[in-house]
A protein has these predicted regions:
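Beta-barrel outer-membrane channel/assembly domains of diderm bacteria
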Residues: 16-144, 363, 388-393, 397-403, ...
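Repeated loop/turn-to-beta-strand initiation elements of outer-membrane beta-barrel proteins
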Residues: 35, 75-77, 134-138, 173-177, ...
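Residues on the lipid-exposed face of transmembrane beta-strands in outer-membrane beta-barrel proteins
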Residues: 37, 63-69, 126-130, 164-168, ...
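C-terminal structural cap/anchor segments
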Residues: 308-387, 393-396
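Transmembrane beta-strand segments that form the barrel wall of outer-membrane beta-barrel proteins
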Residues: 41-43, 137-151, 176-178, 215, ...
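Outer-membrane beta-barrel translocator/channel fold
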Residues: 88-90, 177-199, 206-211, 254-335, ...
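Outer membrane beta-barrel
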Residues: 68-100, 112-194, 217-225, 313-321
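Solvent-exposed loop/turn segments connecting transmembrane beta-strands
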Residues: 151-158, 184-187, 207-209, 231-242, ...
Length: 441
C-alpha cells in the first residue's frame, strides 16, 4: 500500500501559484468558490442462498465537505478543489472469521486485526487545477466517468483515483481528454493502492501497475447524435479501444434512444509473454486459457420513452479467451456496460446477455423527484470447465428527492437485487440510503 502524496503536492502547487498572483487577480478564485456539505446514511444486507454462510450486514454514516474554488484571473487561471470525507460505523455486522456466526462484516469498512470493522475511517482528496481558454488540467484526486474507467460509488464512501487529466473544449461540439492514473483509493480504505485486473489482484502472485494511460473524444455530430472514441492502457496488462454511438430519435409519439458500444481489448507488456504471465500478470478468463488478455465486447440497447415511461431492450456479446479487462482491485467496480448490474457485470469470457428494463418518472403525473426502475439480465454460454455456465440478475430501485420546503435536499433510495446461476453464489441484496445535501456558499 502507498500513501498518496500526489494530491498533496498538487494542492501545494496550485495554492502556491494562486498566492503568487496579485490580490486583485485572486478575487475570482474566492468569488466563484463553492462548498457543499453532504450526509449519507447507508445500510446494506447480503444473504447467500445456496451456501451455508452467514449473511453480510453493515450500516454507517458518512459526512462529505466538497469545496471547489474559482480560478485566478488572467490568461492562465489556477484553482484548488478539496473533497474531505469521513465514515462512522453504526453497525459493523459482527466479526469476520468467527466460528458459528450468523452475520459477518461486508466491504463497507476496513477490518481490524480481530476481524471487526473499524469504528471510523476517512480521507481527503485534493486537486490542483489550471485553466487556459476552454482547456482545463487537473492534478490530484479524480472521479473519472469515461467508457474506459468509471469510479465506483456503491458503498458509503466512493472509490477515488489519483493522477492527472486534461480536458479541452476548444472546438465546438468536440470534447477531448487525456491523462494518466497512478493509484486508486478503494471505497473501504483510507490508503492508496496500485492498479490491477481480475485474475492478478490477489494472492501470493498478485501484480500491480502504476500506469494507466487514457485518451478520448466525444463528438456531437448533431443535436441528436453523439460519437465516441476512447483508449485505455494499463501497462503490463491490457490495451483497450472503445467506440460508441448514442442517437435520440424524436418520433411522432415518444422517442427512441439507440446506444451502441464496442470494446476491443488486447494484451500489453508482461501479459503478452509467457514469462510475464508466470510472474502473475494474468487475466481471469475461459477454462484452460493462458491468462493473456484477448477480448471483444459489443452491445446494443434500445430505449423507447413516452410520458414518463421508458422501456429498454438490449443484447451484449463477449468473445475471446479472457474476461472483459478493466481496473479491478476486488472491492467493487463500475463498468460502462449495459450489463453493469447492482451485483454482477455479465462480462465473462464467451458470455451472451439479454437485458430488459422498465423505468418510470412520476413527475409525469405530478410527483417530481420520485422514480422507479426495474431491470433484468440473463446471461449464458459462459466458458467454464465441463460446460457453459449461465446466470441471471434482477435489479429494482426506487428513488425520491424532496423538491422544496424545509426538507429540500433530502433524498431516499432503496435498491434490491437477486442473482442466481451455476457459476457462483446465489445472492439477495438490499441497500437503503438516506442523503442530504446543503450548499454552504
Amino acid at each position: 500500500m502507498h500513501k498518496t502524496l500526489l494530491a498533496q503536492g498538487a494542492a501545494l502547487s496550485a495554492l502556491g501559484a494562486a498566492l503568487a498572483v496579485p490580490s486583485v487577480a485572486q478575487a475570482e478564485f474566492i468569488k466563484d468558490s463553492k462548498a457543499t456539505l453532504s450526509l449519507k446514511n447507508f445500510y446494506i444486507n447480503q444473504d447467500v442462498r445456496n451456501q451455508d454462510a452467514p449473511r453480510s450486514e453493515e450500516w454507517g454514516q458518512a459526512f462529505f465537505l466538497d469545496y471547489k474554488s474559482g480560478f485566478t484571473e488572467g490568461p492562465v487561471g489556477f484553482g484548488l478543489d478539496v473533497l474531505a470525507m469521513h465514515a462512522i460505523r453504526l453497525d459493523g455486522g459482527g466479526r469476520s472469521g468467527k466460528a458459528d456466526i450468523e452475520r459477518t462484516p461486508g466491504g463497507m469498512f476496513p477490518l481490524e486485526s480481530n476481524g471487526k470493522g473499524k469504528t471510523d475511517f476517512g480521507r481527503v482528496g485534493v486537486t490542483g487545477k489550471l485553466r487556459f481558454s476552454k482547456t482545463e488540467a487537473r492534478l490530484g484526486t479524480l472521479l473519472p466517468k469515461m467508457p474506459v474507467l468509471v469510479y465506483n460509488d456503491g458503498r458509503l464512501l466512493p472509490q477515488l483515483f489519483h493522477g492527472a487529466q486534461i480536458t479541452s473544449n476548444e472546438i465546438d461540439n468536440l470534447s477531448l481528454t487525456a491523462g494518466k492514473i497512478e493509484h486508486s483509493t478503494e471505497r473501504n480504505s483510507g490508503d492508496s493502492h496500485g492498479l490491477s485486473i481480475g485474475g492478478a489482484n490477489s494472492g501470493s502472485r498478485a501484480q500491480f501497475s502504476n500506469e494507466f494511460y487514457f485518451a478520448g473524444a466525444d463528438y456531437k455530430a448533431t443535436k441528436d447524435l453523439l460519437l465516441q472514441y476512447y483508449y485505455g492502457n494499463l501497462r503490463d496488462f491490457y490495451k483497450q479501444h472503445f467506440f460508441g454511438l448514442v442517437h435520440d430519435w424524436k418520433l411522432p409519439v415518444g422517442s427512441l434512444k439507440t446506444d451502441l458500444r464496442y470494446f476491443y481489448s488486447d494484451s500489453d507488456g508482461k501479459n503478452e509473454s509467457a514469462s510475464g504471465r508466470a510472474e502473475g500478470y494474468v487475466s481471469s478468463g475461459a477454462d484452460g486459457s493462458s491468462g493473456e488478455v484477448d477480448n471483444n465486447l459489443w452491445s446494443a440497447m434500445f430505449t423507447y420513452s413516452l410520458a414518463g415511461h421508458a422501456l429498454s431492450l438490449g443484447y451484449q456479446k463477449v468473445s475471446g479467451d479472457s474476461d472483459f479487462p478493466h481496473i479491478n482491485l476486488g472491492s467493487g467496480r463500475t463498468l460502462h456496460l449495459i450489463t453493469n448490474g447492482q451485483i454482477g457485470k455479465f462480462a465473462s469470457a464467451g458470455e451472451n446477455t439479454w437485458v430488459a428494463g422498465y423505468a418510470y418518472d412520476f413527475a409525469a403525473i405530478g410527483v417530481p423527484g420520485l422514480k422507479t426502475k426495474l431491470i433484468y439480465f440473463s446471461g449464458d454460454d459462459i466458458d467454464a470447465a465441463g460446460s457453459d455456465n449461465k446466470e441471471w440478475e434482477r435489479n429494482f430501485r426506487i428513488d425520491y428527492a424532496v423538491q422544496s420546503g424545509p426538507l429540500k435536499g433530502v433524498g431516499f433510495a432503496w435498491l434490491n437485487a437477486a442473482t442466481r446461476g451455476n457459476d457462483g453464489r446465489d445472492l439477495d441484496e438490499n441497500r437503503l440510503m438516506l442523503t442530504y445535501s446543503l450548499p454552504l456558499f
